[in-house]
């Protein structure tokens, strides 16, 4: 076991929802800080809020984190209620709501939303959810944020109140300036899927926006790296699943090539992100072998 100087979480594989309880219980028994789960609509993955609710009930200390939940695909009021419910039921210190906009047109078509306006919609959603989490009704929302609620204006408030005042901890993912600024406008921190060589600049930009907006303290900085650890069949499984997941981007081969598959590579990445000031590093697993949890535990 190595002291890597930062908290380390596990990103859960999406290929077999029934196996996630095993992963969660092993991670809880180990040194890991957080369970993370990605989001897609038109894909064979579990719905993250439902799955993480089950995992939270099967564990007692480990955080549960969406990374990232595609908020623009969802009804805003219902999402606010779901997140507040899970935050309340886990004591206000275990849910981390990682949010992003997504880039798949088929996800947006299935949800009946517009890919082209997804960033603006997320900002509008945050304006509403923050109000709802503070116990305010719909009154006045829509007067300046571009949202239209028709007959819903004046309805509410919508409970339950979250255990954490103002709502669960919110992280934003993304790479563009608008996404990084969103951290300072609405969030508590940043979730980066970039390698350390790139993430340092993103972290600095987020810190700059944080100061520009007059926010107290420092933004929480979370990094994500894709890993697989085990015999050749485990590595082959992870590579195949990663390639299928990223095929739509045209960069599947590049993503697979960046998969970290040795203890030395993973330790180096953990140290690099700790040196950049990351508060946590998520080790994201695509392969289904749950023994990876124990192998990774030996590194952290």
Spans of features found by a protein language model:
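Active-site-adjacent structural elements that line small-molecule/cofactor binding pockets in enzymes
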Residues: 1-300
């Amino acid at each position: 076991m190595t002291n890597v100087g930062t908290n380390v979480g596990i990103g859960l594989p999406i290929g077999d929802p029934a196996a996630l309880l095993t992963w969660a219980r092993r991670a809880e028994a180990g040194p890991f800080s957080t369970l993370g789960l990605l989001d897609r609509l038109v894909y064979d993955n579990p719905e993250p809020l439902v799955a993480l609710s089950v995992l939270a009930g099967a564990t007692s200390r480990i955080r549960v984190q969406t990374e990232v939940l595609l908020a623009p695909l969802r009804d805003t009021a219902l999402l606010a209620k779901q997140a507040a419910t899970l935050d309340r039921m886990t004591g206000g210190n275990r849910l981390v709501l990682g949010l992003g906009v997504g880039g798949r047109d088929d996800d947006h078509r299935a949800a009946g939303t517009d890919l082209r306006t997804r960033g603006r919609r997320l900002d509008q959603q945050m304006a509403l959810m923050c109000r709802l989490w503070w116990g305010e009704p719909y009154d006045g929302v829509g007067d300046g944020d571009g949202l239209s609620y028709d007959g819903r204006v004046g309805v509410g408030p919508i409970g339950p109140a979250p255990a954490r005042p103002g709502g669960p901890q919110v992280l934003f993912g993304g790479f563009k300036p608008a996404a990084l600024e969103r951290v300072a406008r609405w969030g508590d921190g940043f979730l980066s899927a970039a390698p350390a060589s790139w993430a340092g600049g993103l972290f600095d930009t987020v810190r700059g926006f944080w100061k520009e907006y007059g926010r107290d303290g420092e933004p929480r900085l979370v990094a994500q790296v894709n890993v697989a650890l085990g015999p050749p069949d485990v590595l082959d499984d992870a590579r195949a699943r990663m390639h299928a997941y990223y095929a739509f981007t045209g960069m599947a081969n590049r993503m697979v090539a960046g998969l970290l598959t040795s203890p030395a590579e993973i330790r180096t990445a953990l140290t690099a992100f700790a040196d950049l000031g990351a508060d946590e590093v998520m080790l994201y697993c695509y392969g289904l072998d749950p023994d990876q949890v124990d192998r990774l535990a030996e590194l952290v």
